[in-house]
Amino acid sequence: MAAREESTQSANRVLRISQLDALELNKALEQLVWSQFTQCFHGFKPGLLARFEPEVKAFLWLFLWRFTIYSKNATVGQSVLNIQYKNDSSPNPVYQPPSKNQKLLYAVCTIGGRWLEERCYDLFRNRHLASFGKAKQCMNFVVGLLKLGELMNFLIFLQKGKFATLTERLLGIHSVFCKPQSMREVGFEYMNRELLWHGFAEFLVFLLPLINIQKLKAKLSSWCIPLTSTAGSDSTLGSSGKECALCGEWPTMPHTIGCEHVFCYYCVKSSFLFDMYFTCPKCGTEVHSVQPLKSGIEMSEVNAL
């Protein structure tokens, strides 16, 4: 029976990363609340909140504490991750929420401690210089001890996975799941699908620059736009000059490349600049030189139309 309870507790134990994520979410929420609160005072006199910043922060954190830990036994970050605080000092194995005294002490240690850390030097500034120096040394010594205690607590937390902060260890509260967690089955179908799609996308990014889109487009257009003259007829430059061999329209500034077909100047020049091995899509003739069509032949064709 005891072995079964131990296995159940180990299966429902909150992961270390989940507890640390909850702390990071709490810090992010506090920064967001404070930034949104300061936005309300942009139109006021500069430095208005500077004098009362520790007190205003303490009031905001107290407001958050009232509607999170005091009422729901969990911080905002813990609620997101489906965990909450449990009274570790209770001998009953059934879930026991933190007592009211523990919640109040939690507020004193977290909210009051941060307020005292920001206000301690201001409280002793008006004192005598010697007493201020002694108070400063004492405060530095206490802060150093707390930092050392937090470091030792964090090392123990990494080893045992319990009490993520020094405050939790001193008050005897630790994180547990809100509901019993069942064993999760990890499936790799989604990951495999994402890896395949990413690999296919990288392959396309590597392959597409190697494809001559302009040449492929010209080849397809040559299949779609048939020759106006038949194979048996005498194909002359005038009979084939009624349309551009690339775009199929009446040639604008007609030019030739050494074969019997006519091109728009823009079509043939852009294709030749894009591909130095450009060939005529109709007959496959290589570009020797781009020459304008003789005006006499062009005018005769216009008159024939």
Curated annotation (Swiss-Prot):
Lineage of producing organism: Eukaryota, Metazoa, Chordata, Craniata, Vertebrata
Protein name, entry field: Peroxisome biogenesis factor 2
Pfam families: Pex2_Pex12
Family from the record: Belongs to the pex2/pex10/pex12 family.
GO cellular component terms, semicolon-separated: Cdc73/Paf1 complex; peroxisomal membrane; peroxisome
Superkingdom: Eukaryota
Zinc fingers classed as RING-type: ranges: 244-284
Record field: catalytic activity: [E2 ubiquitin-conjugating enzyme]-S-ubiquitinyl-L-cysteine + [acceptor protein]-L-cysteine = [E2 ubiquitin-conjugating enzyme]-L-cysteine + [acceptor protein]-S-ubiquitinyl-L-cysteine; S-ubiquitinyl-[E2 ubiquitin-conjugating enzyme]-L-cysteine + [acceptor protein]-L-lysine = [E2 ubiquitin-conjugating enzyme]-L-cysteine + N(6)-ubiquitinyl-[acceptor protein]-L-lysine
Metabolic or biological pathway: Protein modification; protein ubiquitination
Enzyme class name: transferase
Residues involved in Zn(2+) 2 binding: 259, 261, 280, 283
EC number: 2.3.2.27, 2.3.2.36
